[in-house]
Amino acid sequence: MESFMGQKKTLYACYFLMLVFFLGFNCVHGRTLKVDDKINGGHYDSKTMMALAKHNDMMVDDKAMQFSPPPPPPPPSQSGGKDAEDFRPTTPGHSPGIGHSLSHN
């Protein structure tokens, strides 16, 4: 009887440790987000250019460096076509399901 209780206690301890260990692993499927470089628009500021120039052993004056202003952001497109990246939330109870599209507008 003693060995059965010892095995049961060991089994519960292993189960508890596995539960704690695997608690951090979550299987989550989600929509990947597109990362755009909207912080600096692809242009470097003068401090970054000075650091790059000093790194390359170039002598650059602040006054000699002329930067053009960044181009204006493009206007948002108003396309009516469907794309694979379109996202339209549905009301509860009216989900189209996998492989089906919303055709009843």
From Swiss-Prot:
Protein name in UniProt: Precursor of CEP5
Alphabetical keyword list: Apoplast, Developmental protein, Hormone, Hydroxylation, Secreted, Signal
Q: Name one GO cellular component term.
A: apoplast
Q: Which domain of life is it from?
A: Eukaryota
Cysteine-cysteine disulfides: none
Q: Which residues form the signal peptide?
A: 1-30
Induction, as annotated: Induced by gibberellic acid (GA) and phosphorus (P), but repressed by brassinosteroids (BR), salicylic acid (SA) and nitrogen (N). Repressed by auxin (e.g. IAA and NAA). Accumulates in roots in response to nitrate, nitrogen and ammonium chloride NH(4)Cl depletion. Induced in shoots by osmotic stress (e.g. mannitol).
What GO molecular function terms would the record report?
A: hormone activity
Residue segments, region Disordered: 61-105
Family per similarity comment: Belongs to the C-terminally encoded plant signaling peptide (CEP) family.
Q: Which GO terms describe its biological process?
A: cellular response to nitrogen starvation; gravitropism; lateral root formation; negative regulation of developmental vegetative growth; nitrate import; primary root development; regulation of root development; response to ammonium ion
- Provide the tissue specificity: Mostly expressed in roots, and, at lower levels, in stems, leaves and flowers. Present in lateral root primordia (especially in vasculature and in the basal meristem). Predominantly expressed in the phloem pole-associated pericycle (PPP) cells, and, to a lower extent, in the adjacent phloem. Observed in lateral roots (especially in vasculature), root-hypocotyl junction, leaves, inflorescence stems and flowers.
Q: Where is the composition biased (Pro residues)?
A: 68-77
Instruction: Please list the residues that carry the modification Hydroxyproline.
Output: P89, P92, P96
State the post-translational modifications: The mature small signaling peptide is generated by proteolytic processing of the longer precursor. Hydroxylated peptide is more active than non-hydroxylated peptide.
Q: Which residues form the propeptide?
A: 31-85, 101-105
Q: What happens when the gene is disrupted?
A: Increased plant height with abnormal shoot gravitropic responses. Longer primary root length and increased number of lateral roots initiation and primordia.
